[in-house]
């Protein structure tokens, strides 16, 4: 099960790096659009409170639909709303992009960690997943710093969107591969 576990870990890394790559620069993106720090602080506070609902969805859904379906839905929505940051000059879209990407973050990560937990009985993969998750969280802003420069937000938005969609594909591949290994 090393191959599917590696795919799941790569998916987790991409999800965290992609989200954090944009999240780390969202205030700068907002300032670039002419929003004040006070406005951005209030907007992001409300968006983060809304984001809590993602974790509540996990609580209510559990594994009723498995892990692959919620991960796929979460990454598709996250990718779509990350792409929406291209229209950050429209206040309502900027808010919705922040809120919904926050919801998908709180929703998808538990399923990715749960997927990692399915690959061994002793919990080694999921323990390593904690490390991989943190590496993704640290790498996103690093990559962002290399590409944003003087307001080049388009590149980080596109990279993050691509990373999120690739995350979904890797997670599905991991689940399908794990089932093939289990059937042997």
Predicted segments with their positions:
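Extracytoplasmic gate region of multi-pass secondary transporters
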Residues: 4-45
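Transmembrane alpha-helical segments of major facilitator superfamily
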Residues: 42-51, 101, 129, 133
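Residue-level signature of mid-helix packing/kink "hotspots" within the transmembrane helices
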Residues: 48-56, 137-138
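Small-residue-rich packing faces within the transmembrane alpha-helices of Major Facilitator Superfamily
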Residues: 52, 72, 76-80, 161-168
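C-terminal transmembrane helical hairpin of 12-TM major facilitator-type secondary transporters
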Residues: 66-112
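A late C-terminal transmembrane helix in Major Facilitator Superfamily
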Residues: 119-153, 160
């Amino acid at each position: 099960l090393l191959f599917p576990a590696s795919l799941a870990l790569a998916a987790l890394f991409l999800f965290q790096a992609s989200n954090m790559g944009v999240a780390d620069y969202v205030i700068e993106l907002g300032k670039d659009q002419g929003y004040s720090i006070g406005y951005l602080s209030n907007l992001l506070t409300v968006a983060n409170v809304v984001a809590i609902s993602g974790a509540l969805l996990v609580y209510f859904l559990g594994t009723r639909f498995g892990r692959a379906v919620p991960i796929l839905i979460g990454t598709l929505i996250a990718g779509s709303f990350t792409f929406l940051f291209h229209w950050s000059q429209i206040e309502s879209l900027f808010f919705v992009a922040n809120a919904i990407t926050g919801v998908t973050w709180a929703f998808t990560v538990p399923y990715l960690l749960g997927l990692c937990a399915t690959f061994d009985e002793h919990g080694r993969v999921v323990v390593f997943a904690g490390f991989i998750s943190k590496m993704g969280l640290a790498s996103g802003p690093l990559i962002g710093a290399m590409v944003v420069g003087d307001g080049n937000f388009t590149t980080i938005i596109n990279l993050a969107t691509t990373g999120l969609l690739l995350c979904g594909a890797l997670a599905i591949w991991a689940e399908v591969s794990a089932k093939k290994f289990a059937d042997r």
